[in-house]
Regions:
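Divalent metal-dependent hydrolysis catalytic cores, especially in the metallo-beta-lactamase
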Residues: 101-129, 136-155, 177-192, 208-212, ...
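His/Asp/Glu-enriched, well-ordered alpha-helical/loop segment
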Residues: 280-363
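C-terminal cap of metal-dependent C-N hydrolases
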Residues: 28, 353-407
Length: 415
């Protein structure tokens, strides 16, 4: 009798157990640098959050089970340098045709979070939020430009107007959008001074935010001086591998001031872009142990159609230079999430939002180019297989979550 009752109990328990999770990803290799996980684990999702991380979770414990054997499961990738304020302005990143939509360039590439890097200043930010940020499936944050007009023309004329740095107006917009604005951006300042950087730092101090600096390619002021005397701990210097900034010492190793800046907490971001990544700097810096703090794309029309392509491709370049895979993942998830003040992102932890990238690492002979046509050969390439945003599968390259159409009893609509 007891055996019969036990069998009845177990039979009744199975349906409840099967509904415990919405989705379980099984047999993947989890890389979560923040929580020191680098091992095969099963990951379960319920109600948009990570619900369990175990060596083994039964397939019938979830409404849907997906086998990702041979693949890597990482936090959703975080790209902190993009330009996505699309609009009708000609030759403009801010509300213009040089920006690209976030979702088509983020979601198919394992990216769940982006930060627009100063496309908008305070004047256009309400429109930017209403039309772009609030209507993207990708999670979007923003660095707001110190220039009120933002990046409104390709020749950077607007960004030279020191009279368009209204800290009161800027701070008002930041206060109204503090859930979205994660920092201040200054870029392309061509004058022989650091007015824009100093104003951005002043705004950062006033609003308790970091500054992202695009130093440019100008020889009329000292990058070393800016890094040593103006930037604060937590501030971000993007385009770290763009020449001709003097990052290397006479011995071909990272300059001492770069090492000192890192010790002080200055962050160095890739910001690949269409013209801001050279192997002539990246290789000697990386070979001598100076890895970037964060890997980002500087996504825009020119970079997406050039040698940058997408974030996994930039990650693959850093991998080809000798940075270990786990560190490349750290620089694409945990580190950038922390740099923008959202350390809760960029991790695989029970209770955290289920933003996940499932990645394949192909092995073979691959070539990677920089902006000058320089090439580095690599033996690995990172390929996105799945993207999960807040528990929902939003990209599935090989249809792992689909069913054979003849067997699925699918309802095909007709018109």
């Amino acid at each position: 009798m007891l055996r019969i009752l036990a069998a009845i109990f177990l039979a009744c328990a199975i349906p409840a157990h099967a509904q415990q999770y919405d989705l379980v990803l099984r047999n993947g290799h989890v890389i979560d640098p923040k929580n020191n996980i680098d091992a095969q684990r099963d990951v379960a999702i319920r109600d948009g959050k990570i619900a369990a991380i175990e060596p083994s979770i039964p397939a019938n414990a979830a409404k849907q089970s997906v086998d990702i054997s041979g693949l890597y499961l990482t936090p959703g990738l975080v790209d902190i340098h993009v330009h996505i304020f699309t609009g009708l302005r000609h030759n403009a990143w801010g509300n213009g045709d040089l920006s690209v939509p976030a979702d088509p360039f983020a979601i198919p590439n394992g990216v769940t979070t982006v930060a627009d890097a100063g496309s908008s200043g305070w004047r256009d930010f309400p429109e930017f939020r209403r039309r772009i940020i609030d209507n993207s499936r990708t999670r979007v944050f923003a660095f707001i430009n110190i220039i009120g007009s933002g990046m409104v023309n390709e020749d950077d004329v607007a960004e030279q107007n020191e009279h368009d740095m209204d800290l009161d107006a800027l701070s008002k917009i930041i206060e109204q959008n503090k859930d979205i604005i994660v920092g201040i951006k200054t870029a392309h300042w061509q004058q022989p001074n650091f007015i824009s950087v100093k104003k951005a730092v002043e705004a950062g101090n006033r609003n308790h935010l970091p500054v992202m600096v695009d130093f440019g390619w100008f020889d009329n002021k000292s990058y070393k001086e800016m890094v040593e005397t103006i930037l604060r701990p937590g501030d971000i210097s993007t385009h770290v591998f763009r020449m001709p900034a003097p990052l290397l010492g006479p011995d071909g190793k990272p300059a001492p001031y770069m090492l000192d800046a890192r010790k002080r907490g200055i962050k160095f971001d890739v910001g690949h872009g269409g013209g801001s990544f050279t192997f002539a700097l990246a290789e000697p810096m990386v070979k001598n142990g100076f890895f970037p703090d964060s890997i980002s794309t500087d996504l825009h029309v020119g970079s997406a159609t050039g040698v940058m392509l997408n974030l996994p491709n930039v990650m693959s370049k850093i991998l080809a230079l000798g940075v270990p895979l786990a560190e490349v993942i750290r620089e694409s998830t945990t580190n950038p999430a922390t740099e923008i003040g959202h350390p809760e992102l960029g991790q695989i932890a029970v209770g955290s939002v289920a933003d996940i990238a499932v990645l394949r690492v192909d092995h073979g002979n691959f070539g990677y180019a920089d902006l000058a046509g320089g090439k580095v050969n690599g033996t690995e390439r990172i390929v996105p297989e799945m993207t999960i945003r807040a528990g929902r599968v939003v990209f599935d390259l090989n249809a792992r979550t689909a069913v054979p159409w003849r067997e699925g009893h699918l309802k095909y609509a007709t018109r």
